[in-house]
Regions:
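ABC ATPase "signature
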Residues: 74-75
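A short, surface-exposed alpha-helical micro-motif characterized by mixed small hydrophobic
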Residues: 56-58
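Helical segment within the ABC ATPase nucleotide-binding domain
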Residues: 29-41
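Catalytic Walker B motif of ABC-type/P-loop ATPase nucleotide-binding domains
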Residues: 14-17
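A short, proline-enriched helix->beta-strand linker immediately N-terminal to the Walker B motif
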Residues: 8-12
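H-loop/switch region of ABC-family ATPase nucleotide-binding domains
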Residues: 50-51
Length: 132
């Protein structure tokens, strides 16, 4: 109801602080799809603050990584998740799918791109590896 009231005002920008906190995976998916659909229809920008790193590559176009109030890096999900050591240095983990690909690459010597951070991207990498 609160979100609907805000959207009626047709804001150009919406700032959300940890909107997925406390939600189960289905609730997270439903909320994020709703936000994505409504904002695309109304051409609204969402600035999202989150610690849920698995949501970020799915829904973000641009990422700003911050640590202790300072910007550490800025870029697309592909650019950001291609820097796993930088993320770890600032106490962030990789998305689960990136972590899995990183393990396959480092420990099992699979020729996969460990910076991939979405399920569809991982599927392409695994199919490419299987075809080799």
């Amino acid at each position: 109801v609160a979100f609907a009231g805000i959207m009626v005002m047709q804001p150009e920008v919406i700032i959300l602080d940890e909107p997925t906190a406390g939600l189960d995976p289905v609730g997270i998916s439903e909320l994020m799809h709703l936000l994505q659909d409504v904002c695309r229809q109304q051409h609204t920008t969402i600035i999202l603050s989150t610690h849920d790193i698995d949501v970020v590559p799915i829904y973000a176009d641009v990422i700003d990584v911050m640590d202790k109030g300072h910007m550490v890096t800025h870029g697309t999900p592909a650019e950001i998740f291609a820097q796993p050591e930088l993320l770890r240095e600032h106490h962030l983990r990789l998305p689960r799918i990136s972590h899995l690909l990183e393990i396959l690459h480092k420990e099992d010597h699979w020729d996969v791109d460990a910076s991939v951070s979405t399920i569809s991207g991982a599927r392409k990498e695994l199919l490419r590896h299987a075809a080799e």
